[in-house]
């Protein structure tokens, strides 16, 4: 038996496992997983641990990345709207948006003319409305292609998540407007990045899906460990018995009760996390 038998470690990808913020803003190639993080994760798995990624990325944008990472657990996608097993190439759980989301968001388009957003689905299809430079950089970063439409009413269903991409005061105004709508409580609305505002189905959060994943794997909550850097990670950090964040995390994450701060993502935070887990799970406890 390994020292990490029965332990689940779930990590956010962007700016937690791999630092991608610079590439998103400037365009460029996705950086690889660092050698230090890779070796630490491989050691964790060799000692019986289950390593999973919990990401806001959609299936088409994470599918090319998954084979490059050491993972032995299913992946949480779409910010908690699905669990996907890359080994079996199938969804284990989905919680997609109701079709009515298109009618709910149509008036938002009217108020914010030229609204930029990405719309994701169960498969590899992506639709975009009014792409801007941020959208194009995001498409390059996620190695994705998309079909451009002019209205969300044209978008086919089912929809897994809607991702708005607006910057500056317009982005702030958009978030305030969306959160003020009478239907806002029917969905999950969360910032997943500095300029990203996402809508998923009610209950479709990383926290809800990490609970489901732990149950699926028969992992006790006391052995669930999570690490993340942004607001969309807070639900799973709150669920975890051992919650971590890299020092580049936003302030709200850093102030989450029980959070343990690590080095910056660019300084191999996940490698430090695994070293911390060695202290939590010494050999004599196995």
Which residues fall in each region the model found?
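Mg2+-dependent phosphoryl-transfer enzymes with acidic/Ser/Thr/Gly-rich catalytic loops
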Residues: 4-8, 33-34, 198-286
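Asp-based phosphoryl-transfer active-site loop
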Residues: 6-27, 237
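Short, acidic loop-to-helix structural element flanking the phosphoryl-transfer center
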Residues: 28-49, 94-101, 143-146, 201-215, ...
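Active-site phosphate-binding/coordination module
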Residues: 34-134
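Residue-level signal for inorganic ion chemistry
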Residues: 44, 79, 162, 237, ...
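Short active-site oxyanion
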Residues: 46-52, 72-73, 161, 222-224, ...
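Short, structured coil segments at secondary-structure junctions
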Residues: 69-71, 79, 87, 185, ...
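Conserved acidic, metal-coordinating active-site core of Asp-based
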Residues: 114-227, 231-236, 248
